[in-house]
Amino acid sequence: MMNNFSKIGFILAALGSSIGLGHIWRFPYIAGTNGGGAFVLLYLFLALTIGIAMLVGEMLIGNKGKANAFKSYENLDPSPSKKWRYAGLTLIGGPIILSFYAIVLGWVFYYLFMVSFNLPSDMESSGVVFGELYENGFVPQTLGLLFVMGLTGWIISRGVKRGIELLNLILTPLLFIIFFGLLIYAMSMDSFGKAVEFMLSFDMQEAKKAFTLDVFVDSLGQVFFSLSLGVGIIITYAANSDSHQNLLKSSLWIVLSGIAIAIMAGLMIFTFVFEYEGVVNKGAGLIFVTLPVMFSHLGILGNIIAFLFLVAFSFAGITSTISLLEPAVMYMSETYGWSRAKATWSITLAIIALGMVIVCSICTPAADYLAVGGKSLMDIIEFLSANFIMSIGGLLAVIFIGWVVSKEKLESYTAHFFGKLGFNVWYYLMRYITPLITIIILLAKIAEFFMGEDAVKSILESMGL
């Protein structure tokens, strides 16, 4: 079962896991509203330092542990008690995230098949279309969840080589081709320059926004989420990679390619938004409300562009769903001796069950009973998994590499891709800087959870941060 990825297959699979829905619809917005080019530089700096350091660290755990996340920690733990194996249990974050992620991806498929060639022509009607799906669409949301999880389960059940690698060898390059083609078209539009200015300008007054603590924490959180850190994905994929894989080069490819996709998507999206004076917002509102109206102004060409955009978006989503499911499947297969099919479909059914509860919490009369503090169950699970499970998982990984595995072992593990200076920089980051920054993120998110985002921002502003 081990060493099933080819070298390029491993990079594309890890890249596919990182280029998800949130990376495409969230990064452009926070870049444009938090300093533009200055924020992009800040994000690049953090991704190329902290991000790559953590990627290499998690890859090492899997590449040298050669097992599921739980067992990989155990195999590398030098202590007799082997208690660090429990750090691998953060892989539970994958199925939890997938329970709501599959629902959102189901919305993408709904728009792909039902809306892309019948686009709403104004913001009001577009809001009604999405509102009807979100608040009253129990049947389409259920069908979307079943379709996404059925497709994900089928791919995973085929194995690493015939399932995960084959899918990513096809979809990840196609994703780049579609986005690049759409970007070329966007460059011919009058508003392309405005989109470039919105995302990449270096206005010093606006740049100050990128250097406040809350934006710094937000950008670090985006690094975590966009690189699939903390939930066993990277460890699991690396366990199936070649023992002599250049993990530094692989990490660079993943980070830079992810940034390229995010910037291409952002420039393309905001060109259309500015061309037709749409509303600059983020998340579902941008993708499912604003963009359909913008595309509708182009007639049949807009229908084609909308279709291609949603195809690319669905590609990004499905390469992420398989990465969220694989760590748990590998764990159950290796720990309990289950066949790959049994592990895949058992976990898939459990995710569907949780997903159905979430669907009920947003579009049935049960919504009021499943809400906590005015937040839907979907919002709560999304916030907890993205901000706590991933942060805790990432923190455990960096502490394990920086403080548990011996420096001598790490030097031998990384000798084929790190020189002495490179190793010392990486080791210093993993031992001191990255754990401290991860703790700051975790504390900030805990404060936000209990006090609210606005209250935390007010406190930071009063402190001059």
Task: Identify the residue ranges that each predicted region occupies.
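Loop-to-transmembrane helix boundary motifs in multi-pass membrane proteins
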Residues: 9-11, 17, 142-143, 257-263, ...
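Extracellular loop-to-transmembrane helix junctions
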Residues: 31-57, 140-141, 389-391
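Membrane-embedded translocation segments of transport machinery
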Residues: 4, 8, 165, 169-318, ...
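Transmembrane helix-boundary motif of multi-pass solute transporters/channels
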Residues: 6-46, 232-238, 248-252, 256-259, ...
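Helix-loop-helix connectors at the membrane interface of multi-pass transporters/channels
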Residues: 105-136, 238-244, 249, 253-260, ...
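Membrane-interface "cap" regions at the ends of multi-pass membrane proteins
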Residues: 1-25, 54-59, 63-88, 242-246, ...
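Inter-helical loop and helix-membrane interface segments of multi-pass membrane transporters/permeases
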Residues: 30-34, 67-89, 102-161, 190-217, ...
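C-terminal membrane-solvent junction of multi-pass transporters and transport-like membrane proteins
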Residues: 86-93, 336-348, 382-438
